[in-house]
């Protein structure tokens, strides 16, 4: 899960169905976990 440490700072993808969907508020797309 990309929303969990230590990966959350590296998640940038907002595309549903992908391994990196739904990320932290730190990413450039503004996604949230």
UniProtKB/Swiss-Prot annotation:
Transmembrane segments: none annotated. GO terms for biological process: defense response to bacterium; defense response to fungus; killing of cells of another organism. One of its GO terms (cellular component) is extracellular region. It is found in: Secreted. It comes from the Eukaryota. Keywords: Antibiotic, Antimicrobial, Fungicide, Secreted. Has antifungal activity against N.crassa and F.culmorum. This is Mytimycin. It comes from Mytilus edulis (Blue mussel).
